A protein has these predicted regions:
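N-terminal beta1-alpha1 cap of cysteine-dependent amidohydrolase-like domains
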Residues: 1-108, 119-121, 126, 130-159, ...
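Conserved G/P- and acidic residue-centered "switch" motifs that form tight phosphate/ATP-binding loops
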Residues: 111
């Protein structure tokens, strides 16, 4: 059986290696490794080529973490702690996401990816969690991961992967405020949304933590399995 083909959104940033210091298409290797180890084939989607017709060649879409989403997308003024927006990245990833949802493709959103899912479903974000929860445990410092338990709703996709409680890493200062039409299926002890999904579709799941950082084979395995099922469905319908 051929491996399912999974598109992973990337972004443009400044990068340095050897003698070079230049703009580059960037994606953390952990996402590619997670897909490959679970039996999928990862395809990196360039940030400046987000025509939705590429989805016809894919069996799933993964939206990775990254910089804050432009608050204008959900009708808010920019908080002093919010990153400088990347309008092109926001627009491109939301275009891909909307098309993937319309096509019924499996979608996994990680950190920023969960937040994009919330916006696609009509939700909003909180721009700086310390203002809301009174601590910085979700992002102790730049490049330093926090760790905390997450409680998951029985019967959800997330609970099928982890059980009803798991401990996750954490590196975010923003979070879903209103999930829109998404169903919240995981929260931290302080109430912060940590997982959300669309139960009307086979696999649409966003998580606020980073499964690509320390290795999280269970989540990647569940996602790739859903993509493989989608691939088989497509092969059967084309006969």
């Amino acid at each position: 059986m051929s491996r399912p083909v999974i598109g992973i959104a990337s972004y443009r940033d400044r990068a340095r290696w050897n003698i070079w210091d230049t703009d580059a298409t960037v994606l953390q290797q952990g996402y590619v490794d997670g897909v490959h180890r679970a039996g999928g084939r990862a395809v990196v989607l360039p940030p400046d080529d987000t025509d939705a017709d590429v989805l016809a060649r894919l069996d799933g879409l993964l939206l990775p973490g990254g910089a804050d989403i432009d608050p204008a997308r959900y009708g808010a003024a920019r908080h002093a702690q919010t990153d400088t927006p990347s309008a092109d990245r926001d627009a491109g990833e939301l275009l891909l996401l909307d098309a993937a949802l319309a096509a019924g493709l499996p979608v996994l959103g990680v950190c920023r990816g969960l937040q994009l899912l919330a916006l696609a479903y009509g939700g909003t974000l909180h721009q700086h969690l310390p203002d809301l929860v009174g601590h910085n445990g979700h992002c102790p410092a730049e490049g330093v991961f926090g760790e905390h338990p997450v409680h998951l709703v029985p019967g959800s996709l997330a609970a099928a992967v982890y059980g009803e409680r798991t401990v996750v890493n954490s590196h975010h200062h923003q979070a879903v405020l209103d999930p829109g039409a998404l169903h919240v299926t995981g929260r931290a002890d302080d109430g912060v949304v940590e997982a959300a999904e669309d139960p009307s579709l086979p696999f649409v799941l966003g998580v606020q933590w980073h499964p690509e950082v320390f290795g999280d084979p269970e989540l990647f395995a569940a996602f790739v399995a859903a993509c493989a099922a989608r691939s088989l469905q497509g092969a059967a319908s084309s006969r």
